[in-house]
Regions:
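N-terminus-centered regions that define maturation/targeting leaders and the start
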Residues: 27-28, 75-79
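Short, flexible helix/strand-to-coil boundary loops that buttress conserved ligand/catalytic motifs
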Residues: 71
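A short, polar/proline- and glycine-enriched secondary-structure boundary/capping micro-motif
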Residues: 17, 68, 79-82
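Conserved short beta-strand edge segments in small beta-sheet-based binding/regulatory domains
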Residues: 77-90
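Short S/T/G/P-rich N-terminal loop/turn motif that feeds into the first structured element of a domain
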Residues: 1-54, 62-66, 88-96
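A short beta-strand motif that forms part of the nucleic acid-binding face
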Residues: 61, 74
Length: 96
């Protein structure tokens, strides 16, 4: 699978608050299941503070369509997702 950094932009402050409420009520196991399929899997997510309506996720997927399919149930919260494909060449500045 390919690596993608995906930018998710909430439709409103209310949509962001609702998403935080929904995810806060789920177990990590349930969230992982919801973000995993044979063709797409969320690796990590970064939320932004305050009124910033953007969040970022690192996905592994066969293509953006597979990731969009995995995210279908959350489309009420977000504007269309933006994808940047990344290589497997990672520079880990924390590695020793």
């Amino acid at each position: 699978m390919k690596n993608y950094i995906v930018t998710h932009t909430f439709k409103s402050k209310e949509a962001k608050a609702k998403m935080i409420e929904v995810t806060g009520s789920k177990s990590m196991e349930d969230m992982t299941k919801a973000m995993t399929s044979d063709n797409a899997k969320c690796q990590m997510s970064w939320n932004t503070p305050g009124d910033n309506l953007t969040m970022y996720c690192w996905w592994k997927g066969t293509n953006p369509d597979a990731i969009n399919k995995q995210l279908e149930s959350m489309n009420d919260f977000y504007e269309p997702h933006k994808f940047v494909e990344c290589t497997d060449d990672v520079i880990d500045f924390n590695a020793k």
